[in-house]
Swiss-Prot record:
Its main location: cytoplasm. It comes from Micrococcus luteus (strain ATCC 4698 / DSM 20030 / JCM 1464 / CCM 169 / CCUG 5858 / IAM 1056 / NBRC 3333 / NCIMB 9278 / NCTC 2665 / VKM Ac-2230). Its EC number is 4.1.2.4. This is Deoxyribose-phosphate aldolase. Catalyzes a reversible aldol reaction between acetaldehyde and D-glyceraldehyde 3-phosphate to generate 2-deoxy-D-ribose 5-phosphate. Gene3D superfamilies: Aldolase class I. Belongs to the DeoC/FbaB aldolase family. DeoC type 1 subfamily. Keywords: Cytoplasm, Lyase, Schiff base. GO terms for cellular component: cytoplasm. Pfam families: DeoC. GO terms for biological process: 2-deoxyribose 1-phosphate catabolic process; carbohydrate catabolic process; deoxyribonucleotide catabolic process.
């Protein structure tokens, strides 16, 4: 392990998440307060919580992130694009969309590109107030794909305008692995972000993902990861 980061430096890699169906308003408010204190990169919540989180974080450097087509990716592209634009208009700075997993498994590059492009165009469009768009992360759900399909999904995401590729929703059969992060980094090169999400629970887990090429970490256990230098 050659990566060495202070707690403050590591915090800037982390999207602190609360994405379970039973997440309450009290849970969200607690996550926001803890995330502000820790100085993480973003708070990632389901779209229903975007207005609250964006308002609570308005005077901080912590960004508001939400999820699109989550967790299955089985919505139509039009629905995903609408969901993304609605979330951005409500205050989201970043959106994490789930790909059409079936298209990736079938090797259908054109369908993948079309799906991601619809959301990329919605995410990157200037809003009605002229306040710009949002960063787009594309979840490929690595646990459901072989290596060839992971490469295809990452290539399609980049072609379609993604800013990041992301390993997992955290709601499938497995989460991020060092091997998949490294494969995704090799595939997209240095100009695109790579987010490791799902099963990253300790500081050692996070540093291993960063060593493999991750530039963002999604974690529901952000405070545990940041617990000590």
């Amino acid at each position: 392990m050659t990566v060495s980061l202070t707690t403050a430096e590591l915090a800037k890699y982390i999207d602190a998440t609360a994405l379970k169906a039973d997440t309450s308003e009290a849970d969200v408010r607690r996550l926001v307060a803890e995330s502000r204190e820790a100085g993480v990169k973003s708070v990632c919540i389901n779209p229903v919580w975007v207005p609250l989180v964006a308002a609570e974080l308005a005077d901080s450097d912590v960004l508001t992130c939400t999820v699109i087509g989550f967790p299955l990716g089985a919505n139509t592209s039009e629905v995903k694009a609408f969901e993304a634009r609605q979330a951005i208009d409500a205050g989201a700075d970043e959106v994490d969309m789930v790909i059409d997993v079936a298209a990736a498994r079938a090797g259908d590059r054109a369908r993948l590109v079309s799906d991601v492009r619809a959301v990329a165009e919605a995410a990157h469009a200037d809003g009605p107030a002229g306040d710009g768009g949002a960063l787009l992360k594309v979840i490929v759900e690595t646990a459901l794909l072989d290596d060839d399909a992971i490469v295809l999904a990452c290539e399609a995401a980049v072609e379609a305008g993604a800013d990041f590729v992301k390993t997992s929703t955290g709601f499938s059969t497995a989460g991020a692995t060092v091997e998949h992060v490294a494969l995704m980094r090799r595939t997209v090169g240095e100009g695109i972000g790579v987010k490791a999400s799902g099963g990253v629970r300790t500081r050692e887990d996070a540093l291993a993902m960063i060593e493999a090429g991750a530039t963002r970490i999604g974690a529901s256990s952000a405070l545990a990861i940041l617990g000590s230098d």
